[in-house]
């Protein structure tokens, strides 16, 4: 997604510490309700993280995909104009064409995919405000500024990948050899995921085991079940026969050895010493241990070989030539009882208005952009279009002279987490041991920090990502080659990352947003309960074309 000194300001450091300590309480120090907690997660971390939280709280479900779309009955020459060649728009067009509709797509960009987007070496991207970046990555290297992983249960996306022969490979979400980092813990030195994972589980298991032995659970657990519980804690926490988590064989096989077993005369291993329970707890590094346990992040996860944009390109191939008109900026959407008229201009030759007409329209333009375009819809839908905020997010892709994370750190895929504004370093899950340069995701930023980073120039975002990342990987400064950054509020075709529904906004406006308003219907990730995911975009398209087809059948086809 998109080398010098740039230290975090005292204000940034203070904000990060305050965010860590106050997140679970309101301004009065009172614990938050589930609804309040989800709202705060959405505002500070984004809708994708809020959806993960909803999953863990039992408030979200897997994809509702049940199989290929089946539109029964002939549309009798009905025409549909689709606005936007993202996955929602192309999925709608593909299925409608199969059912016999005449379909045309108007797309702002010179390529298909929308937010299904990869920046490859040699690409040029110009953001709002005019800043232009030419990606200096080597050939075949890329970054995904938008979606970058596909859960195994996102069946609609995966079904199209299979149908269109888009090759997939595993995306490594959890790597026990990656790092967890907090500037306020362990002298600012990063710790391996496995060390924090093993020591946290070990200490918690020991505390619970001792409480059980002392009778603290007598009222909650029978004596027989207490013995089973102790056995499970010994296994889960790598406790010794005395139910203690201490330096020894049991703990070292989980957290790693000080000296690993080898061969020959000097092959005897040396056990490592666990960190103290108070240090583990106060570090708060345990907060990211469960990231891979969330339903959306559980293995197996996938990515297309060669970049996420391979899916968008495959859709465009299947649609065939002439269906998508690129470089088309929509300036007005009108409708009457006979059909829809869309006014647009060619972005390569602006100033001359063009029009496209159809019986029906499926609009996948994000509300963040659509709210700036005259649209003839009813008052309720018009209000819904203007009320949905879009999340701020920034991604920074960094190319290095060598894959030092593999060569020096033995990190192959996965994610390191930090309390620094960059939040995330994600290592490539492909081309292991390949010679030459490599690209990693050097920052994935949400919330207020994302607004801050978006306000900087692309070059400054890259510099900050390198400076912050060097606190985790000192090799950064010597090995850095070039970078590219994308602040989603500066992306011309979205003006934000994704639709950030809250429970209150959904209750008030979601129903209106999903209705077919005369001859115009909406689709996209923002018209779904799987925000920010490609699955939500495709499922919204499937839903709306099913309802639209029923309406067409009821009215006899073409206008």
Give the ranges of each region predicted by the language model:
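N-terminal glycine-rich phosphate/pyrophosphate-binding loop and immediately adjacent elements
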Residues: 66-209
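N-terminal secretory signal peptides
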Residues: 1-33
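N-terminal export signals
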Residues: 22, 30, 35-62
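A glycine-rich dinucleotide-binding beta-alpha-beta segment and adjacent secondary-structure elements
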Residues: 476-527
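Active-site/ligand-binding neighborhood in enzyme catalytic cores
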Residues: 177, 184, 208-329, 337-339, ...
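C-terminal segments that line or cap access tunnels to active or ligand-binding sites in enzymes
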Residues: 289-296, 358-360, 367-494
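C-terminal lid/capping helical subdomain adjacent to the catalytic/cofactor pocket in oxidative enzymes
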Residues: 507-559
């Amino acid at each position: 997604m998109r080398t010098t000194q740039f230290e975090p300001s005292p204000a940034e450091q203070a904000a990060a510490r305050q965010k860590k300590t106050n997140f679970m309480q309101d301004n009065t120090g009172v614990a938050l309700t589930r609804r309040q907690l989800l709202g705060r997660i959405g505002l500070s971390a984004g809708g994708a993280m809020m959806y993960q939280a909803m999953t863990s709280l039992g408030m979200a479900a897997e994809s509702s995909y049940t199989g290929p779309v089946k539109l029964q009955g002939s549309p009798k020459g009905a025409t549909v104009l689709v606005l936007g060649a993202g996955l929602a728009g192309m999925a709608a067009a593909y299925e409608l064409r199969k059912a016999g509709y005449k379909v045309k797509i108007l797309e702002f960009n010179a390529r298909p995919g929308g937010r299904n987007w990869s920046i490859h070496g040699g690409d040029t991207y110009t953001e709002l405000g005019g800043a232009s970046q030419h990606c200096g990555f080597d050939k075949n290297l890329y970054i995904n500024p938008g979606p970058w992983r596909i859960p195994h249960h996102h069946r609609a996306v995966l079904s199209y990948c299979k149908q269109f022969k888009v090759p997939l490979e595993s995306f490594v979400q959890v790597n026990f050899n990656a790092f967890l980092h907090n500037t306020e813990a362990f002298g600012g030195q990063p710790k391996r995921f496995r060390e924090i994972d093993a020591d946290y589980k070990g200490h918690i298991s020991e505390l619970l085991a001792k409480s059980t032995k002392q009778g603290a659970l007598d009222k909650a657990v029978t004596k027989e079940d207490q013995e089973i519980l102790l056995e499970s804690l010994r296994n889960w926490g790598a406790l010794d026969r005395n139910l203690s988590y201490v330096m020894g064989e049991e703990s070292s096989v989980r957290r790693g050895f000080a000296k690993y077993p080898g061969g020959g005369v000097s092959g005897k291993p040396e056990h490592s010493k666990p960190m103290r329970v108070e240090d583990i707890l106060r570090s708060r590094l345990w907060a990211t241990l469960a990231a891979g346990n969330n339903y959306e992040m559980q293995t197996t996860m996938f990515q297309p070989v060669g970049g996420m944009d391979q899916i968008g390109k495959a859709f465009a191939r299947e649609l065939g030539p002439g269906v998508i008109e690129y470089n088309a900026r929509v300036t007005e959407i009108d409708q009457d009882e006979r059909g829809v008229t869309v006014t647009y201009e060619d972005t390569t030759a602006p100033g001359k208005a063009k029009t496209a007409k159809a019986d029906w329209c499926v609009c996948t333009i994000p509300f963040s952009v659509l709210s700036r375009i005259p649209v003839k819809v009813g008052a309720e839908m018009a209000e819904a279009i203007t009320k949905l905020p879009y999340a701020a997010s920034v991604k920074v892709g960094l190319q290095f002279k060598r894959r030092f994370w593999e060569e020096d750190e033995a990190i192959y895929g996965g994610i390191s987490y930090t309390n620094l504004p960059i939040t995330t370093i994600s290592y490539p899950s492909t081309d292991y041991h390949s010679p030459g340069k490599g690209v990693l995701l050097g920052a994935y930023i949400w919330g207020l920090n994302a607004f801050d980073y978006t306000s900087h120039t692309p070059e400054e975002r890259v510099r900050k990502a390198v400076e912050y990342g060097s606190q985790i990987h000192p090799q950064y400064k010597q090995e850095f080659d070039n970078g590219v950054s994308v602040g989603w509020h500066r992306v011309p075709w979205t003006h934000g990352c994704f639709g950030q529904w809250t429970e209150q906004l959904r209750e008030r406006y979601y129903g209106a947003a999903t209705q077919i308003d005369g001859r115009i219907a909406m689709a996209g990730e923002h018209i779904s309960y799987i925000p920010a995911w490609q699955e939500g975009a495709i499922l919204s398209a499937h839903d709306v074309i099913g309802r639209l087809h029923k309406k067409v059948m009821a009215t006899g086809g073409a206008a």
